[in-house]
């Protein structure tokens, strides 16, 4: 931990882009999810530097149980984009959620989104647009994703779109303090084999090799 603190103090990008906390601490109010993918928080990141082909916003969804993140880039985020995102990235991948938490932005808080969610029995919770702490997990994830983007893209400006998959990969495979597990492990039941482990023996690869040998 001491080495990490020293590194961060000497890291120019960390000092420049890491968020400064000016708020007084408040009691922590946990948002409990009864099972994986039952409750999601949705939020919009942007406006980011313009990336080809004209993308400058990211719609982000965070599962409250596993911390798993889904994201898509847009030139602008419309109500139809939100509905399509919920269908494509949440329902079609993880099944119907019990509830969605969003802020009061016009893309979220409207009759179209409410009607779509009502059709599938999804409860919608709205948090004040100027009090995103009420949607705490999504806001914390946004800070992590945007912070990583800024640190990684300081000199690349509009290249954040190419970096988004890497940032999401890091978010999904990094252990979280609350669960002491990575979102990947909670979703798939095993840790991901990272690119840095290519060619190295891991518990997963050793187990797979052992199974293959026993099947011969």
Task: List PLM regions with ranges.
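Amphipathic alpha-helical
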Residues: 1-38
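Domain-scale segment recognizer with a strong primary affinity
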Residues: 11, 39, 68, 97, ...
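Eukaryotic intrinsically disordered and solvent-exposed regulatory patches
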Residues: 26-29, 44-47, 55-57, 85-88
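An active-site-proximal beta-strand-loop segment
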Residues: 36-69, 75
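Short, contiguous acidic/charged loop-to-helix segments that flank catalytic cores in large enzymes
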Residues: 48-50, 73-78, 133, 155-158
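Active-site beta-loop-alpha junctions of metal-dependent nucleic acid enzymes
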Residues: 72-92
